[in-house]
Amino acid sequence: MGKLALAAKITHVPSMYLSELDGPHKGCRDSAIAGHREIGRRCRDLGIDTIVVFDTHWLVNSGYHVNCAARFEGVYTSNELPHFIKNLPYAYDGNPALGQLLASTATAAGVNTRAHSETSLTLEYGTLVPMRYMNEDRRFKVVSVSSLCTVHDLKDSATLGRAVRRAIEEEYDGTVAILASGSLSHRFAQNGVSEQYLHKMWDPFLEQVDLRVVELWQRGEWATFTAMLPMYAEKCWGEGYMHDTAMLFGALGWDRYEGSVDIVTPYFASSGTGQINAVFSV
């Protein structure tokens, strides 16, 4: 049947878009942009038709949700950081059939998930930023999964991730990539001093925990990482409470994962938060 061909944990910092524009920050995120373009290149080489994004900017207060409209088009300004991302045009095709499969398979696994194909829902910037650089030619269809889950258990998100892989491999006729779109630690710099933290972590503790996590990945200590994920998410202000990461590792096998990581964009600080682009073998 289908194939899960690529899995990654990625940054989506809005300063990537700012990095394109003339001004004092032009070029500040060239490395992150290059990492996204490299992941996009790999997706093309692998024959991927659809990218599923676990988006930590899609906030939900009940259930899990899949945005699988047939078409996404508009002009986006971030309500969180309108001085960073403003008037960003986008247009991508969706994949309603795959989105429905993901939702039904997750629900059958015990995690109530709704697919929205006939919808006015738009995409959030956890999806729009990576698609800008990975999907410039609009080759890939896009499906977004809500991953800023306010009252949800990480174990349910891991179950959803497992269901996503099962749906792809057992029910779908095609080749898919999954992206966990969110930071590592995610404590924004305090208002009034944020300009000083464009390339700095908010606190050395957060940086040291992030670096230890990357080391665990590089050493293949997956059982240790998955065991610490709930506390890591809590103590280090995990973006979206790290539900995107739980979904990713659920799809990879959780503590039984035996693969390896390829760091595409090395760990970097952005506005107090910890960021990376990393591809995991599947």
PLM region descriptions:
Residues 1-49, 61-159, 170, 191-282:
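Flexible, D/E/H-enriched segments
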Residues 9-13, 55-57, 182:
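Short loop/turn segments at strand-loop or loop-helix junctions that form parts
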Residues 49-55, 174-184, 248:
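Beta-strand elements within well-structured catalytic alpha/beta cores of enzymes
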Residues 162-176:
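Non-transmembrane, aqueous-exposed alpha-helical and coiled segments at domain scale
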Residues 184-190:
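Short, conserved secondary-structure transition motifs
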